[in-house]
């Protein structure tokens, strides 16, 4: 469960715009105190939006691990996977699935470099294992804006994006919100 109250900032930003933006951010990585995945040249996504208005967050559609119970590739036992693992080349662009405000841009020993974006109405998206973060806490981002690069930081078996969605602090299946 992601606890947004552990973040240094939160937002009431409004939500899931379905129009893509081509703006790009070049700010350097920032950290919050919170500890609680192939289009390498593009600065914004051209993906179509789902019925929820969110877009797929990377150029690759290769889902390597689904939401829910699974045999863990790192723990050697069954575990509950709180998102989708999407295989992609290291350094590939990661795009904001919807417009919102960055509430966490940090490092965690399990998630590696990660970002949490609040989209309003209790909906947040989570992007883990990034090699680089291009946004900072409090920054407004547009749907399709490049926010990070795919990596393998934290507990990871290779380059991928772990993409999660929370509603009211509880993880839900991201495929309810996005489709490859």
Label every PLM stretch briefly:
Residues 52-180:
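Catalytic cores of peptidoglycan-degrading enzymes
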Residues 1-50:
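Alpha-helical oligomerization segments with coiled-coil/rod-like character
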